[in-house]
Amino acid sequence: MGLRNLLDKVEHHFEKGGRYEKWYPLYEAVDTFLYRPGSVTRTTAHVRDGIDLKRMMIIVWLCTFPAMFFGMYNVGHQANLIFAQSPDLLSAQDGWRFALIGALAGFDPNSLWDCLVQGAAYFLPVYLTTFIVGGFWEVLFASIRRHEVNEGFFVTSVLFALTLPPSVPLWQVALGISFGVVLGKEVFGGTGKNFLNPALVGRAFLFFAYPAQMSGDAVWTSVDGFAGATSLSLAAAGGVDNILGHGLTWMDAFLGHMQGSMGETSTLAIFIGGAVLLLTRIASWRIVAGVMLGMVAMSYLFNAIGSASNPMFAMPWYWHLVTGGFAFGMIFMATDPVSASMTDTGKWLFGALIGVMVMLIRVVNPAFPEGMMLAILFANLFAPLIDHFVVQANIKRRLARNG
């Protein structure tokens, strides 16, 4: 018996009046994930398109894979480099992860397999925790509201996991995704009705609730007892010269060979997925261009102003592009169609606001070198207001033209 026949055979148990009626959203989620939905539009107007929400969300999910797989490799590579330089740290490690890594691979920084296994031992538990806990809330709210489980959670779960450091405790992962899904999306009605990006809401909650596990120099590698600064922390302490002094070149930063959140280090891997999103028009090029223009303009402004006490004023825009979560936020977070502006002009303004805000936070606030997360959430709050004024300006322009 084929899987399609099996699903059709048990479907009546989940329909209204069936034995498992309350679990219909879960059945529907499995069915529509594996096969194309059979429902069609029955009233006017009819729109025929080659893409629907399911396909769009799966494409976004797949576009995170370059950043995901490179992130797993880089987590392992950074850890194995530390072990190669300080063998005594390796003997001090314990726990089930290192027992698993020792059984499946080694600790050679030059081995692709060893680095991937090491990184997977940290990323996959985080992702599975995110998916299971967040999926539980999605199914629960879908069952209560009696509507289908939306594929959008595939995107929320992977984006949230990729923004976390490898050393994050799994219970904090569960708490963060619960906060993001429930208070960032479901309380507003679910997918399509939230005005904040739920992945960023969960990440912001963890950052402010548990700063010791979300920031500082000790959280960016999977090695217990080792502390290493990110490129942005190095820049905040001594500018670009300090980054170069630690042996990190611009190309290293662009490729992602540095410490940081699991999916945010490689600008190249992020741009590979971003190119697909832009070519398929799932991501708005206007938002991406607006973010870049806002960031570059503010960077030149701060470069011109200068500061004897704050080295971040002199940091060029092309270094801002490859450090921290700027590229990841610009491609995957800012372009969220639900929480971003919807008008064409509004998208330019929305993106520019993010670019300006991230520079203000990074440069002017020396205690907080990263700013992409807060900049996007801030712009999310203003997106409806931006669209309102754009629409009102358009109405006034038409009235003036037509008398």
UniProtKB/Swiss-Prot annotation:
Its main location: membrane. GO terms for molecular function: FMN binding; oxidoreductase activity, acting on NAD(P)H, quinone or similar compound as acceptor. It is found in: Cell inner membrane. InterPro entries: NqrB, NqrB/RnfD. It comes from the Bacteria. The modification FMN phosphoryl threonine is found at residue 230. Keywords: Cell inner membrane, Cell membrane, Flavoprotein, FMN, Ion transport, Membrane, NAD, Phosphoprotein, Sodium, Sodium transport, Translocase, Transmembrane, Transmembrane helix, Transport, Ubiquinone. Its EC number is 7.2.1.1. Its cofactor is FMN. GO terms for biological process: respiratory electron transport chain; sodium ion transport; transmembrane transport. The keyword NAD applies. It is a multi-pass membrane protein. The chain crosses the membrane at residues 56-76, 121-141, 164-184, 225-245, 260-280, 287-307, 312-332, 348-368, 371-391. One of its GO terms (cellular component) is plasma membrane. It catalyses: a ubiquinone + n Na(+)(in) + NADH + H(+) = a ubiquinol + n Na(+)(out) + NAD(+). Composed of six subunits; NqrA, NqrB, NqrC, NqrD, NqrE and NqrF. Belongs to the NqrB/RnfD family. NQR complex catalyzes the reduction of ubiquinone-1 to ubiquinol by two successive reactions, coupled with the transport of Na(+) ions from the cytoplasm to the periplasm. NqrA to NqrE are probably involved in the second step, the conversion of ubisemiquinone to ubiquinol. This is Na(+)-translocating NADH-quinone reductase subunit B. It comes from Pseudomonas aeruginosa (strain ATCC 15692 / DSM 22644 / CIP 104116 / JCM 14847 / LMG 12228 / 1C / PRS 101 / PAO1). The gene is nqrB.
